[in-house]
Amino acid sequence: MKILVTGRDGQVAQSLAERHGGHELVFAARPDLDLADPASIERTVAAVNPALVISAAAYTAVDKAEEEPDLAMAINGEGPGVLARAAAKTGAPVIHLSTDYVFDGSLDRPWREDDPVAPLGVYGATKLAGEQAIAASGAAYAILRTAWVYSPFGGNFVKTMLRLAETRDALTVVEDQHGCPTSALDIADGIMAVAAAWQTDPAHGANAAYHLAGTGETHWADFARAIFAESAKRGGPVAEVTGIPSSGYPTRATRPANSRLDCSRMANVFGYRAPRWQASLAEVMDRLLPENAA
């Protein structure tokens, strides 16, 4: 099956390049496909004529989005709708990646797909607009919300912690934001589970949202401690972590206090549940510190 993947240089796209399930993946990115340029989207989709579109490109600079709301909306809110409408013309369904930031973090349990959405900032609002544009596009779709994404690729929290530990013995990390660390490699596996199901039955689980995140939960400070524990096993950099409240690390954009996602629907419908986040972290650390892999 020919699959068009947007966001060629992102963590999920690079993970899909490894976990492609034997499909023919065509990766697109600017300038060939620019989510802020509708003509480029329509031109690329028509030229590729895919059987499936994976919408993995996004404006992900959460704090900078507060300063560039129009650009963030063009890329996250409007572009996905153009992409999905173009896909609908070719009969291709769309798997669209979204985020925990569509929720305000106020619940005391993991978020379910049908819980009320209430983004706290521009990034979450634009991603929600993208979900709504996909749903209204006329294309068959699955929206996959994920959170706390890391991988061997690109920039992410795991790589930031390792880099900081190369020059610092101690770090302060917020401990009042809880979530599910998610390997982009696991996201790729989840996407391929949807693709496989749709090859058999294109209507299976279509036109709904799903949560796809690492199994288990933690907070940022303990996630950092787990990173350094794995790094120590491999002879990598380590640092002492002190937990602090979010008020001690102010950011332009407010983050949800609770980003935990209930992934039961994904498991029930598509038979995929990501591994425990600790196991996936160890897998990624083997890639990041291969010379000393445990």
Describe these PLM feature segments.
Residues 38-77, 86:
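NAD(P)H-binding glycine-rich loop region in Rossmannoid oxidoreductase-like domains
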Residues 2-20:
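N-terminal Rossmann NAD(P)H-binding glycine-rich loop of SDR-like oxidoreductase domains
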Residues 275-294:
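Amphipathic terminal alpha-helices
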Residues 190-191, 197-251, 292-293:
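Mid/C-terminal beta-alpha module of Rossmann-like enzyme folds, strongest
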Residues 74, 79-82, 89, 102-144, ...:
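Catalytic helix-loop patch of NAD(P)-dependent Rossmann-fold dehydrogenases
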Residues 11, 219-220, 244-263, 276:
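Active-site loop of classical SDR/Rossmann-like NAD(P)-dependent oxidoreductases
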Residues 21-43:
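Adenosine-cofactor binding site in Rossmann-like domains, unifying the SAM/SAH pocket
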Residues 135-180, 184-193:
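NAD(P)-dependent short-chain dehydrogenase/reductase
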